[in-house]
Amino acid sequence: MKILVFEYITGGGFNKQDLPEALKNEGRLMLQALLDNLRLQSNHDDLSMSVMLDYRINGLINTDGFETVVINPEHNSHNEFVNLVKQCDAVWPIAPEFDGILQKLCQSVETLGKTLLTSPASAVALTGNKFETYQRLKQHHIATVPSRLFTGVVWNKNNEVQALAQELVESGITDVGIKSDQWLVKSVDGVGCSDSYILTSPHDFEQMCSRQGDYIIQPHIQGIKTSLSCLFKEGTGWLICTNLQQFNIINQQYQLSELIVNYDLDLNCYQDLVANIAQAFPELWGYVGVDLIETPAQILVLEINPRLTTSFVGIKAALGINVAENVLQLVKGEPTLTSFCNQAITIHMKQNDSN
């Protein structure tokens, strides 16, 4: 099997413009971890592998065992991607959901009839939209944070804001952990925290209304911010580990400062949630990250990321599990997920990195 790996940020997706620093750092981490996983697996299976690299990243990634295709400024990165896909059997894209980037890559692979080693374009379209994800979660009675589309919301006078407050009460979320008169606004298709804002005053709402783009608004709920690293296939989910996310709040925005992979060794309280998500989102396939916020009342689903997340970087060291090996197993059957160790691994993030 010949596999193409394309991490959008470090692989040439920004070859005609400056690399976004935060996304570049995260992309390098995930790309290196994936190449390391695949390299180990190639020692056992008959695999040949190619990777696309931005000309500014070439030499900064260990690509031993991979055919490296350098993308220069004069290249059309999408055309190069399509041409390389035609030469491969399977493709593993890593890309942000914003502007439909990941969805378009997945659709290209599917159109060319190649094996996609991630969730299909249909799953990316759904989970890449925070409001549609919220609606699907509500439809399947999975606890989530009440959300509305942000459309010219007026401070404390808008029916949608009042409806959010009422939904909090109806959902059984207690006042513990809820910031009165604080709201969180997020880009509908944004990645991480880069386009999310905490609103605390009428002036904040006025400023937010002047921004371009589509946003959702949610009550600002305080709690333990965790994530799940999972595998999914056709309505079945496998939980790999839980992760703890530590944030700083700078200029009314959350910024991920530290990530503890496999922080909670007891996975029992999350197993039913993973099974419910698998049933609610049967489109999901392969590695998926699920962002949560845990309050004294319940565990709430914040987002579903149909791609590799930063937590993936620490899984091999934390559990000895080769995620790439298990994703390849999904192509023909079920993953083994055999762990050889069980420890927490801390990843310190540079300022502005996201998950």
Predicted regions and their residues:
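ATP-dependent carboxylate/phosphate-activation module, predominantly the ATP-grasp catalytic core
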Residues: 218-283, 294, 305-332, 346-350
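Conserved N-proximal alpha/beta basic substrate-recognition cap immediately N-terminal to
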Residues: 48-159, 163-166, 171, 175
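Cysteine/selenocysteine-centered motifs that mediate thiol-based redox chemistry or coordinate metal-sulfur cofactors
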Residues: 334-355
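Short catalytic helix/loop segments, enriched in acidic residues and glycine
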Residues: 19-38
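Active-site nucleotide/adenylate-binding loops and adjacent lid/helix of ATP-dependent enzymes
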Residues: 123-224, 233-235, 259-275
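Conserved protein kinase catalytic/activation segment
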Residues: 298-300
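Extreme N-terminal starter segment of soluble prokaryotic enzymes
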Residues: 1-4
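Flexible, glycine/charged-enriched surface loops at secondary-structure junctions
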Residues: 285-291, 337-342
